[in-house]
């Protein structure tokens, strides 16, 4: 539709059909919704942050930015993320430097160092996404997750990269100032490497176009964001968001990257030959810890894109002990959650140590890391959660090793009739 057929608000993009009143000015329109919003902003104290500013040519300057030290950041991450000590330390330093840089800019200091964007390597379920989520929670900044495989360059069927910024803006309740210091996590970034196979013919087959499109917002630009998402069109109004101070974290499994690194280092150096298809996980982790930008370029990432990530770190595959720790130790550990659910029914849920290791072994066999733990427990406890609310005789449930390994029924301890009465 064109303007002759559909008149829209110049500020929020709502059409005349979506509002009660649309007031016309010289070449502009404003709806009753935006008038009320502006009125509310004017009623606030002058020091208040304007939460819906439509334009931001330069990064906004929130004054309440507190920078945690690397040790403080890691300590908070430790409450939720098990293992990955090297990755957590590296990311804590990168995040500290990133927000220290923003704070320096806010105080009009000359800053010579650039953004500390982070590239996380590691297998599925190793904690890449959880680290990014936890960072956002610690820092109290807006956060959003995007899937790189859904993104396309302009002119192809799919999602524009600006829609990632839109989702961050939505997470910030359209507060541009908060969005401009938020965190964006882009998963499956390895799937847009130029050598990646099995992509749809409707997308940029090489993946290079998507990397080029992402490059602009990652390095810092003023993105024109459609308020309602979707594709851009000439008559549309935009919210302008400066991405210079947004922290970008990208992650991917980068399957076979270890072999590219091995080739660079030399086969005799690491003690295996090309015909050994399956390397031990310890060997893979050792190789990925030695990753260089040239390895990522050989994998299929373009040099300009890789160059915007000065922090590249590997998340190692989780061990059995670490998977068991994930079940029980974090603040929001999944076993603690289920124990609380059963406690609300006045039932004590007990996991034997051997049962926890059996669950961890099952998760390791699934090759999806920590992600498999929740599914295993849900399948294990679903029938019990169905029956327990209707059975007041149950006092405790003990999950044994054979409950997991051999699908045997858990031990159920029942109350005496006197206790029920």
From Swiss-Prot:
InterPro entries in UniProt: AAA+_ATPase, ATP-dep_Clp_protease_ClpX, ATPase_AAA_core, Clp_ATPase_C, Clp_protease_ATP-bd_su_ClpX, ClpX_bact, P-loop_NTPase, Znf_CppX_C4
Nucleotide-binding among keywords: yes
Record keywords, A-Z: ATP-binding, Chaperone, Metal-binding, Nucleotide-binding, Zinc
GO molecular function terms attached to this record: ATP binding; ATP hydrolysis activity; ATP-dependent protein folding chaperone; protein dimerization activity; unfolded protein binding; zinc ion binding
Any one GO BP annotation for this protein: proteolysis involved in protein catabolic process
Residues holding Zn(2+): 9, 12, 31, 34
Any single Pfam family the record assigns to this protein: ClpB_D2-small
Residues where ATP binds: 123-130
GO CC, one annotated term: HslUV protease complex
TM stretches of this protein: none
Assembly behavior: Component of the ClpX-ClpP complex. Forms a hexameric ring that, in the presence of ATP, binds to fourteen ClpP subunits assembled into a disk-like structure with a central cavity, resembling the structure of eukaryotic proteasomes.
Family of this protein: Belongs to the ClpX chaperone family.
HAMAP family for this protein: ClpX
Function: ATP-dependent specificity component of the Clp protease. It directs the protease to specific substrates. Can perform chaperone functions in the absence of ClpP.
Name used for this protein in its record: ATP-dependent Clp protease ATP-binding subunit ClpX
Protein source organism: Chlamydia pneumoniae (Chlamydophila pneumoniae)
Lineage: Bacteria, Pseudomonadati, Chlamydiota, Chlamydiia, Chlamydiales
């Amino acid at each position: 539709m064109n303007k002759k057929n559909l008149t829209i608000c110049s500020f929020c993009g709502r059409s005349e059909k979506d509002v009660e009143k649309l007031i016309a000015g010289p070449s502009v329109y404003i709806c009753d919704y935006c008038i009320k919003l502006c009125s509310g902003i004017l009623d606030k104290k002058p020091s208040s942050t304007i939460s819906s500013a439509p334009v931001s040519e330069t990064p906004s300057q929130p004054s309440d930015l507190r920078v945690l030290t690397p040790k403080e950041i890691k300590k908070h991450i430790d409450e939720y993320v098990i293992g990955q000590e090297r990755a957590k330390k590296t990311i804590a330093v990168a995040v500290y430097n990133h927000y220290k840089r923003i704070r320096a800019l806010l105080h009009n200091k000359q800053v010579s160092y650039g953004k500390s964007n982070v590239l996380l390597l590691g297998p599925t379920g190793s904690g890449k996404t959880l680290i990014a989520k936890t960072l956002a929670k610690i820092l109290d900044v807006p956060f959003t997750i995007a899937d790189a495989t859904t993104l396309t360059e302009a002119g192809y069927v799919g999602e524009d990269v600006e829609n990632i910024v839109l989702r961050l803006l939505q997470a910030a309740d359209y507060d541009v100032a908060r969005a401009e210091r938020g965190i964006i996590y882009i998963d499956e970034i390895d799937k847009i490497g130029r050598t990646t196979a099995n992509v749809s013919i409707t997308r940029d087959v090489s993946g290079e176009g998507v990397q080029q499109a992402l490059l602009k917002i990652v390095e810092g630009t003023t993105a024109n964001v459609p308020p309602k998402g979707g594709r851009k069109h000439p008559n549309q109004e935009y919210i302008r968001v400066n991405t210079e101070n947004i922290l970008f974290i990208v992650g991917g499994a980068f399957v076979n990257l270890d072999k590219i690194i091995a080739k660079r280092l030399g086969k005799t150096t690491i003690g295996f030959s090309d015909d050994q298809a399956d390397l031990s996980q310890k060997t893979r982790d050792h190789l990925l810890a030695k990753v260089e930008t040239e390895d990522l370029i050989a994998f299929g990432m373009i040099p300009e894109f890789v160059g915007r990530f000065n922090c590249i770190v590997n998340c190692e595959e989780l061990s059995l002990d670490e998977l068991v720790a994930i079940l029980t130790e974090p603040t929001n550990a999944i076993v603690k959650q289920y124990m609380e659910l059963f406690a609300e029914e006045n039932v004590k849920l007990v996991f034997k140590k051997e049962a926890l290791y059996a669950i961890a072994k099952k998760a390791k066999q699934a090759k999806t890391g920590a992600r498999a733990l929740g599914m295993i427990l849900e399948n294990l406890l679903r029938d019990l959660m169905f029956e327990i609310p209707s059975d007041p005789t149950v006092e405790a449930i003990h999950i044994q090793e054979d409950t997991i390994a051999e699908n045997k029924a858990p031990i159920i301890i029942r109350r005496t009739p006197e206790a029920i009465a």
